[in-house]
A protein has these predicted regions:
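Glycine-rich ATP/GTP-binding catalytic cores of kinases/NTPases
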Residues: 1-142
Length: 142
């Protein structure tokens, strides 16, 4: 129990150090998720780390909602000058997917990436499925 004046307990910040936990939570019946990391994981600027995590989280949420039975692969690449997060699913092709909900998933990803001076691709993959790929600069982050 807290005493007056004590701060409320805080949950750990969401960042890519918690990627394994995110992948475990996203794996549900009908969606198998796996993760790959390339490059040496290292501390990142807070905004980049949080944005990378949230983009993966939103892409996995979209895969669960729209892909149908599928496998999703999360790739996190630590480059010297940037961080790249990519989520591919092999679910239903874009023509077979239900119309997007009124949510702000991809728009929110675009805003996060733009605020950090990065690039985002979100669209169908050749041969079916969907890809979300964000490149976030780690040096000179605004």
């Amino acid at each position: 129990m807290r005493q007056d004046g004590e701060a409320a307990p805080r949950s750990p910040a969401s960042g890519l150090a918690r990627l394994g936990e995110l992948v475990s939570q996203a794996t549900v019946p009908g969606l198998k998720v796996r993760a790959e990391t390339k490059g040496k994981a290292r501390p990142l600027p807070f905004g980049v780390d949080a944005a990378g995590y949230r983009i993966v989280q939103e892409a996995l949420t979209n895969a669960r909602r729209h892909a149908g039975p599928a496998t999703a692969t999360v790739r996190v690449t630590y480059g010297e000058e940037d961080l790249t997060v990519q989520v591919d699913d092999d679910g239903l092709g874009p023509a077979a997917r239900p119309a997007p909900a009124a949510g702000n998933g991809i728009a929110g990803m675009r805003e996060r990436v733009s605020a950090l001076g990065g690039e985002l691709f979100a669209g169908p993959r050749p041969g079916g499925g969907f890809r979300v790929r964000a490149r976030l600069p780690v040096n000179g982050v605004r």
